[in-house]
């Protein structure tokens, strides 16, 4: 009985991490599977060892095609010779990956016999089961003003007087490309002012449009004229999720590759107007070593990356791409300066940004808006803030550069100037940091020199903060009412 108990408890201990399955042969590459996401049957991501170059990868893929074709042929013969025998058709190779020279591999739909041969190939480092990925939104609520913009431009908690006041530098985002790796974008929406572009559709057979709204909402928070943090940035929609808000891990990796290649190509042109690139991924699934490596490779290529921490009120380190160490992982905060009830947390969470009841652009018309919640809404605030800061201090690989600002340096800078200690319900292993845009200053050097800020109200409760907002509103109301009464009294007296 003791042995049985230990075996049944084991999955509970490892459920949060990728585990190797079917690896009974020591000389075979392991197959990784995340216990926190849903695997896609017979779909795999294969990653090469570091010594494999593009030429060797191409030769391997030619070998793979031969193996897959031979297996398919044998199954066809078996089908013809055995009455009533049926077999699933396997697609074979789906994607190849070569991200910034540091991640080579491919994805596809293969029979287990083919996978066994791939596992034994000396070029293969590991195989990961492809899995479902989803958006990180938390459902619709009643529309309200975009308070999130106001919050990141003020140090102290919002009050009635600054509730809708966003302080910003007008040139924020100018010359910066923002890759939104999501469900697509409503590029014709008026809030984008013609700055939104369709980049790439990754899912096979899907339309070049956002049939969901999630990607459009994120894009608006990044770069919309009314709803955006960086109001002059360019948006490039990279569609990796279908209209239902879900997709495959391999499609997401391919989307990251497309963004990295587009950035590298743009940076080599020497365009004086180009200042750098940022990317946002408000999506996630279980732990995926491949996706984390892909994001890290894109950062190494020069893209400033923001990702959502996740909405399970759990440790963000157990989710991808939240666990990608070189990206900025973003948790969600509320109007009352508390951690949103759904927001993930932990040491992999770098910073918090507004994520509850966020108003932004939507689909259905070129004027549509919607209010939704999630770490999906928090991450675009940071992606927009990255674009904002890059435009004030252009990235190193920009021909317009006046400062050496790499993604690593800007991540450190963004964290260093954040507002500290203002949030409640923050676990002890989680940074209590809220994003800040410099309060409207366009002087990047001064923003960094001024450094971070410890909130005066760090010890107050959520109830106190809400009460303060209500008190401020009541005082303003009574003041206005008194002025109206005086005017009426004067008019009557006259």
UniProtKB/Swiss-Prot annotation:
Domain Inhibitor I9: 43-136
Function of the protein: Serine protease.
Pfam families: Inhibitor_I9, Peptidase_S8
Biological process annotations from GO: proteolysis
Enzyme class: hydrolase
Record propeptide residues: 17-136, 454-494
InterPro entries xrefs: PCSK9_ProteinaseK-like, Peptidase_S8/S53_dom, Peptidase_S8/S53_dom_sf, Peptidase_S8_His-AS, Peptidase_S8_Ser-AS, Peptidase_S8_subtilisin-like, Peptidase_S8_subtilisin-rel, S8pro/Inhibitor_I9
Domain Peptidase S8: 146-448
Catalytic residues (UniProt): 182, 214, 376
Identification of the protein by name: Subtilisin-like serine protease Pen ch 18
Any one GO molecular function term: IgE binding
Keyword Glycoprotein: yes
Family note: Belongs to the peptidase S8 family.
